Amino acid sequence: MNQNKPTSKLISDFWKGKTSEELFERAKKVSPGGVHSPVRSFRSVGGTPVFFASAKGATLTDISGKEYIDYCLSFGPLILGHRDPEVEEVVRETTEIAWSFGAAEPYSLELAELISSRVPWAEKVRFVNSGTEAVMSALRVARAATGREKILKFDGCYHGHLDSLLVKAGSGLAGESSSDSAGISATSIANTLVLPLDDEASVERVFETEGKNIAALIIEPLPANYGLLIQRKEFLLKIVETARKYGTLVVFDEVISGFRVGFQGMSGLLGIWPDLVTYGKIIGGGFPVGCYAGKKDLLDLVAPSGPVYQAGTLSANPFGMRAGLATLKKVQRDSIYSVLDDRTKIFTDTMTKLLNKKSNQEWEAVIHSSLFWFRKKTQQPIRRIDLIPEGHKESFAKVFHTFLKNGIYLAPSGYEVGFLSWAHDDEIIAKTLEIADKALKTF
């Protein structure tokens, strides 16, 4: 019996007898590109996106009833897997409590207290609805606190789709940036400086000329939105030291890495305390939640305590707060991180061997905790986007479709990382590797 099968006749009748191809054609008539976030369109890998109907544990089920072992996991929020039983029970309870208050309530307080008690640099916490909102708000706080306007970011780090950060580096040193999207005005990015990762010297030179104008340096301490570009600790320490020398606030974007690589995220693993930090994904337990946190004096600048305005109708909604709280409590109670790390290494080591055995190119897995990224093997670690091997996108697309056809779902882009969850137990991993071994015989 398929435990993922939807029970509502009203829901299942909508797609009964339909194919993903049919639904995608209909979707393109009513939504841009047929999707509600670009990567879901399969544009990067080609083909038609699979329309999924349900999910449970480590498994996705499409509208035809076919099952897939999921290593995308909604791009990171589901560290316990789909519909973890404990979280699901809390969600069911919440339907009988409230769907939204738009008022003060105790659930956000409990989650904020848990985060603040375990994350010392998160002295105060403000919940929002997404990682993009969290970053936007954190940078607003940084500008207010410093009285400065410029923001320094790094090529290869993604911080959401706010205008000022959809910027790529130009050919010059931080001064010739261009937007990553149509519809963004030149004035929106005029105060954004962009530098390559893994280059301390460039950071120092920019601060020598612009230091007094830079409100915040923002970085993913574990860049995981353009492949997995693991940075040297020495680089991170140096840029933080340089920023603080000039009175610039340090913002760590831990929307992906927060509560994924450890309860204190990369900041805790590195022993580097940011001034402000952004979280998302895991803290909502699968619901749309983000937050920004930091030192008390900085967060007290936010309305109604201070002059920095930020608000949201559904901020701290009870579903996200209670699901996030249940997730973090279970993560904390069951000490899942070391187990997930071990499982990820076992999975990626064996999968890499299978790929290398069947493929005409040599693959390797870049891993950190329970994140992984398969790519062409290189002589040196890849820490910058300009060093990603040519042809990677095409090579990954072939692997993606080989696996998809046989019931393994990876993120549909060669530049997206994969994830394991608590639901990916030894049996699921063994089954995945068995499927991959058979699938790659026709690779």
Swiss-Prot record:
Compartment(s)? Cytoplasm
Q: Which reaction does it catalyse?
A: (S)-4-amino-5-oxopentanoate = 5-aminolevulinate
Could you name the Gene Ontology cellular component terms for this entry?
A: cytoplasm
| Cofactor entry | pyridoxal 5'-phosphate
Q: Per the UniProt record, which EC number(s) apply here?
A: 5.4.3.8
Q: Which GO terms describe its molecular function?
A: glutamate-1-semialdehyde 2,1-aminomutase activity; pyridoxal phosphate binding; transaminase activity
**Keywords tagged on the record:** Cytoplasm, Isomerase, Porphyrin biosynthesis, Pyridoxal phosphate
| NCBIfam families according to UniProt | PRK00062.1
Put simply, this protein is called Glutamate-1-semialdehyde 2,1-aminomutase
Name of the gene this protein is made from? hemL
